[in-house]
């Protein structure tokens, strides 16, 4: 039985992590932590997330007390702000914990991105070089040996799962940039209240065009330029991405289906649609990424959907945990 700690368990993704790990047959949640200024310190998890009453009744502790138990911990999940994870990762690694970081703090190799997009100077360049990117379907062999797994962003997960097979098989026209329109539910902005996320203000609207934080992550990991247009949708959870690309001549629907089947046939959390297109309804509160596509002439439109809190965050983190420790990939997830 592995002892785990979850930091940031009061947030949406953190709560989903607690849910998954609570029912994990080979893990024991030792502690759940919140920030030192959190109003939830000493509250029960089920008082903050009432859907878990009589299911998970652990008590929140302040992160200040994490030093007291670090010697008895096998794995740590960080569902925290980027700057918080930036500081906590070296601490937990020095305590011989395997770290699963859901923030962006160790995702990218380019140190300058953190100043340009996240507003802080990254102080741990060596850890950046040694971190393993936790796109579970693509990095399993590296994840098995990693001490620091940096989980992808929610948009970045969905988009890469679509485009990586097509780029690897060289079926996209080199002269045309993939254009990505993606809509996320409001939970993607976190649990903290703000005017833009309030019930009366939320709408369907684009935001951070060309400047979204996931843009450099997507480009770095795909190795090709993209145009990424994120939108905020008037719903609580889920992401749907519509990606338009130009194909090389004579690429047919059967070719694309065979490509996706080649890479994802034995990947239980990827579902390929042959006749239909995905919807948010199909993935809400589910750990899957669903992919479908339509081709006309030399153009392909691929639609992908995921729950941003699950496959885009908590489910993928637990998937990486399972891979790292040699459990079934879907243990506690499905």
UniProtKB/Swiss-Prot annotation:
GO terms for biological process: L-arginine biosynthetic process. One of its GO terms (cellular component) is cytoplasm. Keywords: Amino-acid biosynthesis, Arginine biosynthesis, Cytoplasm, NADP, Oxidoreductase. It catalyses: N-acetyl-L-glutamate 5-semialdehyde + phosphate + NADP(+) = N-acetyl-L-glutamyl 5-phosphate + NADPH + H(+). It is found in: Cytoplasm. CDD domains: AGPR_1_C, AGPR_1_N. GO terms for molecular function: N-acetyl-gamma-glutamyl-phosphate reductase activity; NAD binding; NADP+ binding. Its EC number is 1.2.1.38. InterPro entries: AGPR_type-1 (IPR000706), NAD(P)-bd_dom_sf (IPR036291), NAGSA_dehydrogenase (IPR050085), Semialdehyde_DH_NAD-bd (IPR000534). The active site is at 154. Pathway: Amino-acid biosynthesis; L-arginine biosynthesis; N(2)-acetyl-L-ornithine from L-glutamate: step 3/4. It comes from the Bacteria. Belongs to the NAGSA dehydrogenase family. Type 1 subfamily. Catalyzes the NADPH-dependent reduction of N-acetyl-5-glutamyl phosphate to yield N-acetyl-L-glutamate 5-semialdehyde. This is N-acetyl-gamma-glutamyl-phosphate reductase. It comes from Buchnera aphidicola subsp. Acyrthosiphon pisum (strain Tuc7). The lineage of its organism: Bacteria, Pseudomonadati, Pseudomonadota, Gammaproteobacteria, Enterobacterales. The gene is argC.
